[in-house]
Amino acid sequence: GTETANLQIRVFGWSQSGFEEQYRNQREVIGSPPVAKIEPGQKQLVRLTRTKDVPPGQELAYRIIIDEIPSAQPPVAEDGKTAAAIRFQMRYSVPLFAYGAGLWSKEDSARQRDPKGIGLPQLSWRTVAVERRPYVEVRNQGAVHARLTDVAIKQGSQSKPLAEGLLGYVLPGAVMRWPAPGPVAGELAGRINGAAKVQSIPPAR
């Protein structure tokens, strides 16, 4: 951009309960600097320091929240007068996952991973009605999160998308739900954690 950006960087613990995203203050992962001033055309490196080990075999989820702090000075037009403008305060939310010993979810080109430690989401789904509106409910009983994209309900040759692109995340042990595009019947499928191929999600038993 053409203006100096003042940013606040915070890291929150992230969980899911009652079909909602939950955030908590925490000191397990610290972002530095907490406030940054970035001049036009420049970059800012943010360092993340973990102060506490993750329990073995577990995945912990965090959200890095980057907020733009509005300037106290109004924008100035080319003629030197105060410019009338609509100013938007931007917010960026970046997921962060930390793993305990014996668990991993992505390949590491720098070192060999133990195949026994690979963590996979274990998903199932069902339909529910909330105030007479159909919803798709997805449960994750696996050890790691599931990032769901391009999710659709398929019935024969027809496909009804729940979302174009990112639908959302389901953290380990959590249940999330999303509104369905009409009555639900058929198969639920989508891309899980960026997989190249669309995968079917089994119905709940």
Question: Where in this protein do the model-derived segments appear?
Answer:
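Terminal connector regions
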Residues: T51-R113, L120, V184-R205
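Envelope-exposed proteins and targeting segments
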Residues: A5-L7, R27, P34, Q42-Q44, ...
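Gly/Pro-rich, tryptophan- and cysteine-flecked surface segments typical
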Residues: T2-V11, R27, T49-R50, P95, ...
